[in-house]
Amino acid sequence: SRGLGDVYKRQDEVYKIELLMKQAKISTEMRRTVPAALAEAARECGPAAAIELPDGSIETGKTSNLLGASAALLLNAVKALGNIPHGTHLISPTAIEPIQKLKVDYLGSKNPRLHTDEVLIALSMCAATDKNAQIALEQLPKLKHCQVHTSVMLSEVDIKTFKKLGVGLTSEPVYEHNRLYH
């Protein structure tokens, strides 16, 4: 767990990095995912994320009633990589709702939205009977070395999922909620 001292240490580290970047005449906006994520967040008035795919295209994800921004981003990315139409539901909302009920009613979570690991498990279950979900699942290795930026700091579980996928991740130094611990 992180304490208040860790927050101050992190702020000092951020300041040092910002200073080094200024001296090197580089900015975060040089990563194409940064302005894309921030623009999506401004458009949606909520958390958003962007990924640069191997072909250089940018996909975004936003927070919804069902999914966190990072989970939506992963689904949009694998759809794009698998040439699956954007409007296609890889996971039925009726499949997501029981997972949300489990999280909130039985596991005590305050956040009903699916995280990245949960959405990937749901996708793998759907892949057993849905060809598009199977195609999407097969795209996951293509995410290795892709770059992601999020408009808010992520939960530990989302950070770990991106790391396991081999995705480079940065985020704005902003918490989604006014809480010290995510």
Language-model segments: what does each one mean?
Residues K9-K16:
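Cyclic nucleotide-binding regulatory module and flanking cytosolic helices
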Residues G3-Y8:
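Short, small-residue-biased leader/transition segments that mark boundaries at the very start
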Residues Q11, M21, A36, I96-H182:
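C-terminal binding/interaction regions
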Residues I17-D117, A127-D130:
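Conserved mixed alpha/beta catalytic, RNA-binding, or beta-rich assembly cores of soluble enzyme
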